[in-house]
């Protein structure tokens, strides 16, 4: 469907959430590989792809036709998913919301950390702020509410949870997710990659 004057939104329907996610990621990969004239950017999320284009070079109808032709086609080459092992200092000044998350779940802070570490978090897409890996697969026993009031500044590397999702803030920015830890690592995962968090006891000197 048209989405403004220079974009088309394609939404997957039917099947499981995993199947819808796989379908939109595959569609985005095929269109990107084809280097379609006029297409400027592709934003693939859980069940939709936003195809942004230069309206001086192509039209809604042409882009929609391209999407229909690409749907269901196999990706010519795929990159195996990477597993990222990410060190995290949990709690304290680096994870000030960990006690609140524990209360919400009826667990101890240590138990929350244990479940967070045991989870193989799957990167579904990168979002805002730019490049933030949006992950799911939570083993926590319930969804987590957002903060009542968003923070005006969340430090770079903060590890946060909300709902049944997890994110790492790649840059300092405002945010309303619950901060449970912080990592000194810099990573650039792609959709489909897996993130495993590993607890460390102190923030590295000089970072």
Task: Outline where the language-model segments fall.
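Glycine-rich active-site loops that engage anionic ligands at enzyme catalytic sites
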Residues: 1-207
